[in-house]
Amino acid sequence: MAKEIEPKLQTIGVYLKKSDIFRIPEYQRAYSWNIANCDKLWQDVESYIAQDAEDPYFFGTIIIDCSREGYLNLIDGQQRTTTFLLLLKAMHLRITEVLHNMADTDEAAGLKRSLQQSLDFIFEILYRADVRKQIEIEKDWNRAKGVKILENVSINELYKEELANIVEAKTFADAEKAVYKFPRKQKDNKYTNFFRNFKSFYEKLHAYQESNLDVLVNGFLTKCQIIEIKSWQIEQAITMFNSLNSTGMPLSDADIISAQLFSKAPDEIDFKAIWEPIIRQADELAQKKVINIDSVLQQFMYINRAKGREYETGQLNTPGVRKYYTVIKPELLNDPIDICAKFDRILKIWSQIQVYPLTKLLLKFNENFKLFLISYLFRVPEQELSEQSATPIMESLLRLFALLE
């Protein structure tokens, strides 16, 4: 007999202290929380702790699919769970530093013991380590590596090892060395959301003296709560997510469409092998402010509408990207391999032409030219595309938009 849905009100500490591995499934989005999201979380916790309220603070509902033994598939709550772990690692480093510098006096003994208990608890969460194993890790930090608390297999996540690189670091400097850096980016812009958010938490914790730090950490672990809803049927878990997801980050067009493509792919491994390079190439072009994955979907929509001569129907309103793929032309998603080849073609065109002087000029001059240019160049055979063949259409677009401006 199938297990029933199991809802539980849990503190953050109890929720994260699991023997099973948290898992972000293939169809989920990439880690998208930014500094603004983390600042909001921090302010909520800080304000709640300052009020010294008796009632717990509620961080919403987290939905978990338990259909695979040993894993907790995060259907709703991946962004919060990842962020909680980044905050815990920042707390781990800061408490370690504070304990190292605290005077060994009778007056400080109680506070020191309380901070050590919090550190022990965080060790149990991040490294599945009891006190004995914690001592072994502190003697040889290599023992902390390879302990898996969260597995990310999302087809949309390019930086799957970032969380582990941060958690496995002994110091902040070690974490900074281990994480990915975007080339040609300066200051915090060179880091992923994972490290930027972790760094922000770590810096905020430096404003706290020993006693205030103890109160903050204890409050976060033992007074802040979530409702964990476990389901042993994935379809049931996703249905609950669709019903309850009113406070999470809105899903992007690419989030929705990639999930549908994944569900329709005849072979999941083959699809991942095709989709992940698309996401990586789109991310590289987005870093250069050329095009992102949502723009790729939009551009193919315009290309396909023009190819189908939809402008002849008299319907002049342009549909939203999501509606076009899921309602108006859902059959486009029935062949994931074919449509991914179209997306890949668009990305290859932009990768090739981004270096052309006229492209650089148009990118600075007017964003709207992209839809016109890609619709034209998509028709050009790949072997015939060159700066010479692209120049006439780009010069024409430059004149047109100069007049419109």
Language-model regions: role of each:
Residues 2-307:
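Glycine- and hydrophobic-rich flexible loops that cap the catalytic core of alpha/beta enzyme folds
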